[in-house]
Amino acid sequence: MASSKELIEENCYVALTHEHLDAKVMMDKVRSPKAGAIVLFAGTTRDNFGGKPVKELQYTSYEPRALQSMLSICKTILHKHSLTSIAMIHRLGVVPIGEESILITVSSPHRQAAWRAGEEALEECKEKVEVWKKEEFGGEEGGIWRANRDGAVGERVDEDEEKKKPDMGPHGPILRPSRPGERGHGPVVRNHQLGS
C-alpha cells in the first residue's frame, strides 16, 4: 500500500491510504500461531442510501489526528478483549461502488472475543475517528458531506452554487481549498478594509 500513512504499536496496526484495500494483507498483519480466530470486517460502498442511487463515496480526513484516534481505539480494544492483534485501515479519496472503504481485522485465541472486538472496533471508529464522507448521488442529486457515522446529518453540496458564493466572515469572504486534501490550514479570510 504505497501511499499509506501508518502507525504500529504493541500488536496494533492502523493506516490511512488512497489505494485499494487488500483483505489478505490485513489478515496477515494479525495472523499469529497464538490466535485461534481471525475476524475481518470489510465496509463496502453500496449503490444506494436512503432510497437514492449512490454514484460513489469520497472520504477525507484530518490524517494526524485520525491515525492517533485509530491507534487509541485499537490499543483499548486489544487489552479489553485480550486480543492477539488488531489492525484497521481506512481508505481516503474516491471509493467506487463495490469497493471497500474500511478493513478491520482482529485475532484472538478464541472466536467470541474476536467477534465482539471486531464489532466494537468498527463502532468506535465510526463514532470517534476524524474521517468525513461525501455521498455522491446519481442524477441531479449532487452530494452530501457528513460525519462518517450512522445517522449523521449531512450538508447538501451543490457544486455550482458552492463555487459561486463564498462564505462570509466578519471581515469579508472566506476562501477555502477548492477540494478535500488541497493544501491549506483552514479558511483564509481576506480583509477588504485592510486591502489584504
Swiss-Prot record:
EC category name: transferase
Binding-site residues for substrate, renumbered to this chain: H110, R111, K126, K133, K134, E135
Reaction catalyzed: 2 [molybdopterin-synthase sulfur-carrier protein]-C-terminal-Gly-aminoethanethioate + cyclic pyranopterin phosphate + H2O = molybdopterin + 2 [molybdopterin-synthase sulfur-carrier protein]-C-terminal Gly-Gly + 2 H(+)
Chief place where the protein resides: cytoplasm
Pathway(s): Cofactor biosynthesis; molybdopterin biosynthesis
GO MF terms, alphabetically ordered: molybdopterin synthase activity
Cell location: Cytoplasm
Gene Ontology biological process terms from the UniProt entry: Mo-molybdopterin cofactor biosynthetic process
Pfam family, one: MoaE
GO annotations of cellular component type: cytosol; molybdopterin synthase complex
Region Disordered, annotated ranges: 142-196
EC number in record: 2.8.1.12
Entries under Gene3D superfamilies matching the protein: Molybdopterin biosynthesis MoaE subunit (3.90.1170.40)
Protein keywords: Cytoplasm, Molybdenum cofactor biosynthesis, Transferase
Family matches, as InterPro entries: MoaE_sf, MOCS2B_euk, Mopterin_biosynth_MoaE
Bias kind Basic and acidic residues: ranges: 147-168
Described function: Catalytic subunit of the molybdopterin synthase complex, a complex that catalyzes the conversion of precursor Z into molybdopterin. Acts by mediating the incorporation of 2 sulfur atoms from thiocarboxylated MOCS2A into precursor Z to generate a dithiolene group.
Assembly with partners or alone: Heterotetramer; composed of 2 small (MOCS2A) and 2 large (MOCS2B) subunits.
Family to which this protein belongs: Belongs to the MoaE family. MOCS2B subfamily.
PANTHER family on file: MOLYBDOPTERIN SYNTHASE RELATED (PTHR23404)
Protein name, as recorded: Molybdopterin synthase catalytic subunit
Gene it is expressed from: cnxH
